[in-house]
Amino acid sequence: HRGGQGSDAKTGDGAGILTQLPDRLFRETVRHISFPKKGDYGVFMMFLPREERERMRLERTLESIILTEGQDVLGWRTVPVRSEVLGSGARRTEPVIRQCFIGAQAMEGLTFERTLFLIRRAFERESEQLGLEQYVLSSSSETIVYKGLVTTDQLRAYFDDLRDERYQSGFGIVHSRFSTNTFPSWKRAHPNRYLIHNGEINTLQGNIRAMRGRERRLAETTYGNRAEEVLPILDETGSDSSMLDNAFEFLHLS
């Protein structure tokens, strides 16, 4: 796909890759964590603030939510990157990229994926209440997203993990963004959590209204008395393709 660049030529409009969790890489490089079997742990891939106090507050908030949901906090990892490959525009807004590993307790498969979804939605709400910015790229026991305000050539150079032969996946879905109706940013790079999509959805407002009209009934069918915790389904501050991803994620987990 065509990829846009900023005025400094080294700042891309965003690029990334969606893969299966690199289980072997984690087991062999994250030595301070004792991993359960594959499928029994999930990973939150996150953009967090560079300011340490804000970052620590967000991390403690997430840990509290995980424990409230009855799951285990296995540990944290700072994703190794090479910031020197970035353009000046990307460097100015570069976040700290962290991974939180979550152990499943008495659940697996789709039930665990739904619990990770509930944890993320609670974390998003509490972060907003705290007035702290964060972004969860992916929150799953099955897949993970590596992305940033980079070009396709920079993606592998920036993330050390992507150059490691122990990073193994049965698939890799790659996207390079050409920003049109929204300004480039780290979180707006693709892939989204589930989909790669070029946007330009002509029926966007009609789709949003249709989802608003049926989301409560849909949520109650799957989440019962916890439906309120996943509403609204769409983050209307995002791009059209990210809202499509919101809808797809919800329907997939339902």
Predicted segments — roles?
Residues 1-254:
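Conserved short alpha-helical segments that host acidic/polar catalytic motifs at enzyme active sites
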